[in-house]
């Protein structure tokens, strides 16, 4: 089951698992794969605490960190507060949410914005928004690079040049999420080390193209740009599905060479 990803990180299985749970990150890495901590909702202090815990429990195995780092942040929305953005939610959506909560007898006090819960929610939104700006993202990256991570992943388009530069300076591979072959070409041209090709089965975050269609499309599209490692994501939950995706990648490589 060896692949370029296995050789790159010296892992036994070509399986990279994203999780917000530090315990899962450690378990995956110690089982022969590679765990990646989703940290966009962390403060720098929270990230330091989690990464220190991982370092103490992972027995020197490789792991990574995943963030959302925009290539640029411009436009009329850049100066809006969390409350401004909340007020932009259409009333139709609010009514629909209330109906669903009532239909399934869900206690919606927090979702309806009770005073205490609303303050907590706004604080969380504020932290999330700050981490999407360069100053907030840089602070998280500085914490991440102060630990022995081997991968930093960006789940929001082409990483900005300063993020790619930080990766090179710290000898850390940079991965980026994508959902179309056009995205892949832009990522490769920017200098990304690993492409995370996510089909619509992966929550629909990147687009509407199925994983088994998207992966070979991307493989063919980047062939002329060199041998860039690909991680397939979306709808891969069993050993059979994992084997199918690996076969898809191998067949596409052979076909492109003919």
Residue ranges and their predicted role:
Residues 227-231, 241:
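A generic structured-segment signal
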Residues 182-190, 237-250:
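Catalytic cores of alpha/beta
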Residues 230-236, 253:
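Glycine-rich beta-strand-to-loop/alpha-helix junction loops that act as flexible
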Residues 251-258:
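Conserved small/polar residues in nucleotide/adenosyl-binding loops
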Residues 1-226:
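Active-site entrance/lid segments in N-terminal catalytic domains of soluble metabolic enzymes
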Residues 158, 236-237:
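Residue-level detector of alpha-helix initiation sites
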């Amino acid at each position: 089951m060896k692949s370029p990803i296995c050789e790159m990180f010296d892992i036994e299985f070509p399986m990279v698992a994203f999780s917000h749970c530090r315990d899962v990150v450690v378990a995956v890495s110690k089982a022969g794969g590679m765990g990646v901590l989703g940290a966009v909702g962390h403060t720098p202090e929270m990230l330091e605490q989690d990464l220190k815990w991982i370092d103490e429990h992972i027995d020197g195995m490789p792991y990574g960190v995943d963030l959302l780092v925009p290539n640029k942040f411009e436009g009329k929305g850049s100066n809006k507060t969390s409350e401004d953005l909340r007020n932009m939610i259409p009333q139709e959506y609010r009514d629909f949410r209330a109906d669903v909560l009532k239909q399934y007898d869900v206690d919606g006090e927090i979702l309806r914005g009770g005073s205490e819960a609303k303050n907590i929610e706004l604080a969380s939104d504020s932290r999330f928004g700050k981490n999407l700006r360069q100053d907030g993202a840089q602070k998280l990256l500085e914490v991440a690079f102060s630990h022995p991570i081997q991968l930093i992943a960006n789940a929001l388009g082409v990483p900005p040049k300063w993020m790619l530069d930080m990766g090179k300076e710290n000898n850390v591979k940079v991965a980026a999420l994508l959902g179309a072959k056009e995205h892949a070409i832009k990522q490769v041209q920017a200098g990304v080390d690993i492409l995370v090709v996510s089909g619509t089965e992966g929550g629909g975050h990147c687009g509407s193209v199925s994983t088994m269609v998207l992966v070979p499309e991307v493989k063919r599209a980047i062939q002329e740009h060199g041998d860039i490692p690909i991680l397939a994501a979306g709808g891969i939950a069993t050993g059979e599905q994992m084997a199918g995706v690996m076969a898809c990648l191998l067949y596409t490589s052979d076909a492109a060479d003919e």
